[in-house]
Amino acid sequence: MRIRPFTDSDLQTLIDLTIETFRPFYEHYVHPLLGDEVFQHQHGQWEQDYRDDVPTLHDPIAGRRVAVAEVGDAIAGYVAWRPSGKPNSGEVYILAVSSSHRRQDVGRQLCLHAIDQMRADGVRFVGIGTGDDAFHAAARALYESLGFTKIPIAGYLKKV
């Protein structure tokens, strides 16, 4: 596996990979949890949201960076990180690994790469967020194995 900087030619592959990675979360967890009406209101355009968001992830002038993991000639995953808005702080904003490359240390190596890059830029505190659902269990285990501390935060939504 090789980790390298993002190039513009990666963009469509990363968009597709992001949608592939998170489709089960939205279709099999969020949609049944929220029901049709609330899901459509909150996340009905989730694929388009990623199509709009992924192109903004890499902006070195703003301190936002992306690194890509390759296995052979295939993109196996990517990580995006950015400043968090607090002094000396950053965050891993998104980590996506293709289904065919999971459980092969790709996510771990991408996270370590992002942390190392942030440290080199003077960051002393790194945050990362994820869901507390079954879909994100592997991500939580990874982050905890990297020394991150889980902070109990709950979010609620109600139609009124």
Regions found by a protein language model. Give the residues of each.
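Extreme N-terminal starter segment of soluble prokaryotic enzymes
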Residues: 1-3
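Conserved acetyl-CoA-binding loop-helix of GNAT-fold acetyltransferases
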Residues: 97, 103-116, 141, 145
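Short coil/turn segments at alpha/beta junctions that flank glycine-rich nucleotide-binding fingerprints
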Residues: 104, 121-124
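Acetyl-CoA-dependent GNAT
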Residues: 5-93, 98, 111-112, 117, ...
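Conserved active-site alpha-helix within GNAT-family acetyltransferase domains
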Residues: 108, 124, 132-152
